[in-house]
Design a protein with these regions (language model features):
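N-terminal accessory interaction module
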Residues: 1-55
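Active-site/acyl-donor-binding loops of N-acyltransferases
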Residues: 1-17, 55-75, 201-285
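A conserved beta-strand-loop-helix scaffold within acyl/acetyltransferase catalytic domains
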Residues: 1-17, 52-59, 68-180, 195
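Acidic-and-aromatic substrate-binding clefts and catalytic sites of carbohydrate-active enzymes
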Residues: 29-32, 103, 208-214
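Well-ordered, non-membrane alpha-helical segments in soluble/globular domains
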Residues: 31-39, 127-129, 186-190
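Surface-exposed alpha-helical segments enriched in charged/polar residues
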Residues: 39-43, 87, 135, 189-193, ...
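A structural signal for short coil/turn segments at secondary-structure junctions
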Residues: 45, 137-138, 199
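Aromatic (often tryptophan-rich) hydrophobic motifs at membrane interfaces
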Residues: 142-244
Length: 285
């Protein structure tokens, strides 16, 4: 979902989403802090839970990861099939950095058509909600757009959070008709080239393992563009009442997952996160 509140705690930028705190700062930059310190931040801001990572990309396989690319790649480095699709995408579309004003004036219809593709519990934004969300994004946000070469129409856009020579491809929205013409191949190729080759960033990332929906985008990036899993240990602390609720509901997680109603979907996501947290704790111990 595009749009979120943001704040700074523990020398880290945080994203406030649906009453919880998630790191915006890259996991490679996070300072070490205890669960007790995290609970004090959580309580002072009256949030439901706080999530973060440690031991990022240290070679230990865990149940939690980010999908990253840390090696610059030219077109000739890609498979012949991927090269062909990138070229076909670039033949039909122009991909370039765009301004926030351009997103505000042109991107809502792209967002709306792309949103319909996702199976998610999240609510679709109205135009005004979308505009307010884009306006509120942090100054570290960079936008990329994809335009049809014939019509000039915007058919896709990406919202990237940039910090410490890392670009996080936070949300990306494609019109379905543009996807069929390989717009995604063109956009990822151009953004990877820009950040890794031209600006010499440490890495680019499409974010952490998804809990709420399956876009298959991570598999796509791994198989087509050489992204990889950077494993980490997942940490979560909860508000006191939620900690009790999670502990009580955890043995019922498989049953709750089968109920497709909205509140149960959210509960299932929360319990999946807790399952991963426990698995990571076992590895650490």
């Amino acid at each position: 979902m595009i749009g979120y509140g943001h704040s700074v705690h523990l020398q880290t930028h945080w994203r406030d989403n649906q009453g919880a705190l998630f790191p915006l700062s890259p996991p490679c930059t996070l300072v070490t802090f205890s669960d007790a310190v995290a609970r004090s931040v959580l309580e002072s801001h009256d949030k439901l839970f706080m999530r973060w990572e440690s031991a990022f990309d240290q070679g230990h396989h865990t149940a939690w990861w980010h999908i990253i690319k840390d090696q610059a790649v030219t077109l000739s480095d890609l498979s012949s099939n991927t090269r062909s699709k990138v070229r076909r995408g670039l033949k039909s579309f122009d991909c370039a950095s765009i301004s926030r004003d351009t997103v505000l004036s042109e991107a809502y219809e792209v967002y709306k058509s792309a949103f319909a593709r996702y199976e998610t519990h999240e609510k679709e934004f109205s135009r005004n909600e979308f505009l307010n969300a884009v306006k509120a994004l942090p100054d570290q946000t960079e936008f990329w757009g994809v335009r049809d070469k014939v019509s000039g129409a915007l058919v896709a856009f990406s919202e990237n959070y940039v910090e410490a020579e890392v670009s996080f491809y936070n949300t990306i929205w494609f019109e379905p008709s543009a996807l069929r013409k390989y717009s995604s191949y063109a956009l990822f190729y151009e953004m990877n080239l820009h950040y890794l080759e031209e600006r010499k960033f440490r890495y680019v990332s499409d974010g952490a393992r998804s809990l709420s929906h399956d876009t298959q985008i991570h598999d796509f990036l791994e198989s087509k563009f050489g992204f990889r899993k950077a494993y980490a240990r997942l940490h979560v602390v909860y508000a006191p009442w939620l900690r009790v609720a999670v502990a009580v509901a955890f043995p019922l997680r498989n049953l709750i997952e089968k109920v497709r109603l909205g509140p149960f979907k959210k509960a299932s996501i929360l319990l999946k996160q807790e399952e991963i947290r426990r698995e990571c704790a076992k590895v650490a111990n």
